[in-house]
């Protein structure tokens, strides 16, 4: 990837873009009118684009910006007293969650809002574009109210891959360790607005040995969100599978 700016950037946007390119040791290009032509001209798969708004990622497949998406609706439902499928699986005394797959950020936001100040959420993201977009989004975006904004700010986002992180994590480091690798098998829809995200994602496999690392680093539970037919759920490690007929996702739980 490379770094560029929006069309007609102000001085601050130009400065930020140049500094980020230098920091990441990747190339900065002066913005040209057509990003498709820039991609072909310079042989780049995508660009981190800086402007007055938080950085976003562009690729030929689409554009990815940080936004809260369905997290807002899920929190709205919880405020009305309805349960959330993921949060319902957390132990009642949970004070720390490691989200190994930050990705589209929704679950990290939900978990941080649910735990509030009594707990912490640390999230991992290996993809450099998704990490940069996520880091700025968490710091800059404001929610509909103070609680939502505080939930965003409390998330600690690290640029790391989950295998390497878990291999070196101390035993019993987190109450819960969570994985959501399901975007490898997207739910089929007539329109898919997530191609920009998918083009930036890193598709690290969630394997049985990674789950063993997670079981060592977790104190109470390991939770995996996957498609119901996932081979992971047939490894014999999971003590519970939560899913209903007609749902496109299921949660596997390893109780420790």
Task: Describe each region flagged by the PLM.
Residues 1-96, 109, 124-176:
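S-adenosyl-L-methionine
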């Amino acid at each position: 990837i490379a770094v560029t700016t929006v069309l007609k950037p102000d001085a601050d946007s130009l400065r930020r873009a140049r500094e980020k390119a230098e920091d990441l040791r990747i190339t900065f290009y002066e913005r040209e009118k057509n990003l498709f032509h820039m991609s072909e001209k310079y042989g780049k798969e995508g660009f981190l684009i800086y402007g007055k708004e938080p950085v976003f990622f562009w690729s030929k497949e689409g554009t990815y910006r940080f936004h809260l998406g369905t997290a807002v609706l899920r929190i709205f439902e919880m405020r009305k007293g309805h349960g959330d499928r993921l949060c319902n699986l957390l132990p009642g005394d949970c004070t720390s969650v490691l989200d190994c797959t930050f990705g589209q950020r929704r679950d990290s936001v939900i978990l941080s809002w649910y735990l509030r100040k009594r707990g912490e959420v640390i999230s991992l993201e290996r993809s450099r574009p998704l990490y940069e977009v996520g880091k700025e989004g968490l710091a800059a975006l404001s929610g509909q109210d103070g609680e939502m904004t505080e939930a965003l700010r409390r998330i600690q986002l690290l640029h790391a891959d989950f295998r390497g992180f878990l291999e070196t994590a101390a035993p019993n480091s987190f109450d819960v360790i969570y994985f959501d690798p399901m975007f490898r098998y997207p739910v089929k829809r007539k329109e898919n607005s997530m191609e920009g995200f998918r083009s930036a994602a890193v598709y690290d496999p969630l394997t049985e040995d990674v789950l063993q690392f997670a079981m060592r680093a977790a104190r109470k539970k390991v939770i995996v969100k996957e498609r119901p037919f996932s081979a992971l759920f047939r490894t014999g490690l999971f003590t519970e599978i939560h899913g209903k007929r007609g749902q496109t996702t299921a949660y596997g739980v390893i109780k420790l």
